[in-house]
Amino acid sequence: MEPLSLTVYDRNIWHLFKKEEGAPQAMFPTNIKYIFEDDDDVADVDDLVFQQQQPDSELENVIIVEIDGAGQLENVELISDQYEMLSYRRERPVSLASQRSLSWLTSGNDTGGDAGKKSGDISDPAAGPDVPREAPLSIELELVSEFKDYRNLNLEDLKLDELTRIFCIQNKQLQMISDALN
């Protein structure tokens, strides 16, 4: 099974009003369980809960990622009461061999005893054997969480064009959710 990287972004406009460092809207799902089409050992959703969690705990959000036998992304589905999926996209980063080549180019010290070596040659002993491998499949999901009550915010401080932009973003999200339901 090829490694998988899953990143979830909450595109709720509420994050535009928060003044936090970093990216509070980015989430990295945990409690991941691989289920294969021919698995008979997963009887129900309760089997997906980590043993370290409380036995009576419930899963809140389930992301189903369908990948074919060749490792190609077929579909992503979200089951949640708190989030609606806006979109997903597959990202395949540069292969590991290419990453080594790029790092050799950027850190290149071409003036050593390797005068015959071309820039970007990855036969460098420190780089290890040049075995071309694919980088992990990377999937990014864009979700929107429940809309918040904005009455507590001081919206009078915002300019009209900023309020219009926020209104347009939220309308676009609502339209995407509506289209997905049809």
Swiss-Prot record:
Alphabetic keyword roster: Autophagy, Chromosome partition, Cytoplasm, Cytoskeleton, Karyogamy, Microtubule, Protein transport, Transport
InterPro entries found in the cross-reference section: Atg31 (IPR018621)
Cellular component annotations (GO), alphabetically ordered: Atg1/ULK1 kinase complex; microtubule; phagophore assembly site
Location within or outside the cell: Cytoplasm, Cytoskeleton; Preautophagosomal structure
UniProt keyword ATP-binding present: no
Primary location group: cytoplasm
Organism domain of life: Eukaryota
Pfam family, one: ATG31
GO term, biological process aspect, one: protein transport
Chain segments carrying region Disordered: 105-134
Function statement: Plays a role in starvation-induced autophagy. Involved in mitophagy. Functions with ATG17 and ATG29 at the preautophagosomal structure (PAS) in order to form normal autophagosomes under starvation conditions. May be involved in microtubule function, such as chromosome segregation and karyogamy.
Name of the protein this chain belongs to: Autophagy-related protein 31
Organism: Candida glabrata (strain ATCC 2001 / BCRC 20586 / JCM 3761 / NBRC 0622 / NRRL Y-65 / CBS 138) (Yeast)
Biological classification of the source: Eukaryota, Fungi, Dikarya, Ascomycota, Saccharomycotina
